[in-house]
Every structure is written in C-alpha cells, then in structure tokens.
C-alpha cells in the first residue's frame, strides 16, 4: 500500500481528498498538513513513511515549492504531485524546476487525480 502525504490549506478539500484516497485499496494517507510550517514538521517526523507527496502551491504561510525544496535538499526522491488552483502558461515547467514531478489542476477529475498519483508511484511522470 502506497503512503501519501497531503499538504492543502483548505480543510474541506484536504479532508475530502484524504477520504477519497483512503477509499482506494492501494493508497493510504499517513500525514496531512494545512500550512507550510505544519508540513515541514510532518515531513520531518514521517519522512520514512511517505511514498508520495501531494502539495498545494499557494499556502497562507508560503509556497508549496518551499516544502519540495526542503525534501530535495534532504535527499528525498519521493515523487511530488502539485495539485493547485493556480494557473499560468509556464507553471508546469516552473514547479518541475522546483523539484516537483507533476502538476495537476484542482479542476481535474477524480479519475485524472488518481491516475496521476498511480503513474508517479510507478516512477513515471504523469
């Protein structure tokens, strides 16, 4: 079973997404955070338990790429999916340059989100 870490500041979205992932037979949410500070603590405490991180970009106390930078600086190769409402023509390239593996809009379907997660867990870009 793949263990997922969620960083999302909107509680209702984070809880709904965690519930969705928890209903999948191959996925388990092992940590959740609603802010960059909380995410840094959770990631440090549970680094060995995380198989994939789903990271929101725009947070009340920073940008999700700061957590990605921290993970990469610590030598983590855990795949990272940025799931955001932000838009921009160069956003995918930018988040990848910051260490993320893929970017997906929060407007994506549930099937697209689950497919992207499973693709990244298999070691490929979505």
Predicted regions and their residues:
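Active-site residues of response regulator receiver
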Residues: 56-57, 84
